[in-house]
Structure formats: structure tokens, C-alpha cells
Amino acid sequence: MKLTCVLIVAVLFLTACQLATAENSREEQGYSAVRSSDQIQDSDLKLTKSCTDDFEPCEAGFENCCSKSCFEFEDVYVCGVSIDYYDSR
């Protein structure tokens, strides 16, 4: 009978220790689902090819414009359809 009581107390003690340890490790980790979704969003941003919108500054000779056209306008290179395009219509 004494042995059974000692075993029950030991099992309860070990269970309490495991629960306390699990709670502490969860607080240190944070929410893993939130962390993993943030990591996925960051990796999506790195994988997505970004382009420069129309009328934003661009670098001549590089195809970084969404419209694939970088032209000089008032001493600055900008993305978009050049004014010559509108004049030829």
C-alpha cells in the first residue's frame, strides 16, 4: 500500500514538473503559427519580382519598370509610356 502511494505521488510530481516546463517553453517561443506565417510572408516578398510603377524614378538601361519602358523626362528617368508614344497616335 505504501509503495502504491509513493508511486502515485511520484507520477503526480513528474506530471506537474512537465506541465510547468511546457508553459515556460511556450512563453519563450511565442506563438509558432504567427512566427511561421511571418516567415512565409517574408519569403514571398523576397521571391516576388518587384517592378517600378509608372511615373516613378527608374534607372536607364535596366528593365525594372512594370511597363518595361524607362524614359527621360525633365532630366530625370521615369517609368511609363513616353510622350513620343502619345504624339505618334
From Swiss-Prot:
Entry GO CC: extracellular region
Record keywords, A-Z: Amidation, Disulfide bond, Ion channel impairing toxin, Knottin, Neurotoxin, Secreted, Signal, Toxin
One protein family per Pfam: Conotoxin
Primary localisation category: secreted
The family this protein is said to belong to: Belongs to the conotoxin O1 superfamily.
Domain observations: The presence of a 'disulfide through disulfide knot' structurally defines this protein as a knottin. The cysteine framework is VI/VII (C-C-CC-C-C).
Tissue: Expressed by the venom duct.
Location of this chain's protein in the cell: Secreted
Keyword Secreted: yes
Modified residues (Cysteine amide): 79
Name assigned to this protein: Conotoxin Bu5
A molecular function (GO) term: ion channel inhibitor activity
UniProt source species: Conus bullatus
N-terminal signal peptide: 1-22
Cystine bridges: 51-66, 58-70, 65-79
Chain residues in the propeptide: 23-49, 80-89
